[in-house]
Regions:
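C-terminal recognition in membrane/secretory proteostasis and scaffolding
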Residues: 7-8, 16-285
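An active-site-proximal "capping" alpha-helix that borders the catalytic cofactor pocket
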Residues: 1-11
Length: 285
């Protein structure tokens, strides 16, 4: 996760991409994690430990059961950097911690046991980070992103956008929260005359209508399912639609209620550009 965090950050620090482009990438990363139901069931430590038999062998239910230790790990690294900066009044950063780890490796040429990373981080910075590491690594609690991003001049607003929105950066702080969009609650592959479900998300419209992966939706309210995204978007929240679909070659009919999207799309904006760029282009490390 730490290396994933630096992937995009180094592009911004080297001015290969603009600060606004970096924030757009960050908003997309935050959104991907927030829209993963598995984040509520699997901790970062569990995700790492079971990577070879779960993360790298994903199935139709994986979005409901696991979280990416790359994606959430990158956000955890961002949070760690901001916690270290705040607690040390700017004397230490994640950069300086990583450099100290590298110097230690040069002396010993040995790797770091699991608990030693935290111990060395605390010893080097002189900070008590036990609560942060315990909560971040070993529980399924959401990361305090809004609170920490505010310390570097970045605002975070959660919006109930369609799942395909993906997160965004706004040049100006939003003056209002958009009305919630509708959400079908599933991923699907659209074909010319039907949509085949690939993943059904916990708690969404599709799951509540007892739909399953591999179901082939052929009609919505009597009309051929030629564009499920567009047809679903035309239905008002709270309405009931009738679906015709095939499952294992058998035709079924189900009524589905149009649910509002969850407020899980991240929109970032700059509240203090000087503060943000001082963090982004930090040259002390």
């Amino acid at each position: 996760g730490i290396t994933s965090y630096y992937d995009d950050l180094f592009l911004a620090r080297s001015r290969t991409i603009a600060p606004e482009a970096y924030l757009r990438l960050l908003a997309q990363s935050i959104t991907r994690v927030q829209q993963t139901k598995g984040r509520l069931k699997q901790s970062l430590a569990e995700s790492s430990f079971t990577a070879w038999n779960k993360f790298y062998k994903q199935d139709e239910n994986s979005p409901n059961a696991i979280v990416s230790y790359y994606q959430k790990g990158a956000l955890a690294a961002l949070c760690l950097d901001l916690v270290v900066r705040n607690k040390s009044s700017g004397r230490h950063t994640l950069d300086s911690v990583m450099q100290q780890h590298y110097r230690d490796w040069l002396d010993t040429r040995q790797g770091i046991p699991e608990k030693q990373w935290q111990a060395r981080c605390q010893a080097f910075t002189g900070l008590d980070l036990e609560d942060f590491f315990q909560t971040t690594l070993y529980t399924t609690a959401d990361l305090p992103l809004a609170e920490l991003l505010a310390t570097i001049g970045i605002g975070l607003q959660w919006q109930a956008q369609p799942r395909g929105h993906g997160g965004a950066f706004l040049p100006e702080p939003p003056t209002e929260t958009p009305a919630p969009a509708s959400d079908f609650g599933a991923r699907f592959k659209q074909n010319s005359d039907h949509a085949t479900l690939t993943h059904v998300f916990n708690g969404g419209s599709a799951e509540n209508a007892a739909l399953c992966p591999q179901d082939k939706i052929i009609a919505i309210d009597g009309y051929a399912c030629t564009d499920l995204t567009a047809q679903w978007a035309q239905l008002p929240i709270g309405a009931t639609a009738r679906l015709h679909y095939f499952r294992t070659g058998i035709l079924y009919v189900a009524d589905i209620t149009v649910q509002a999207a969850e407020a899980d799309t991240a929109v970032l904006y700059i509240t203090d550009r000087e503060l943000f760029e001082n963090w982004l282009y930090n040259d002390r490390a």
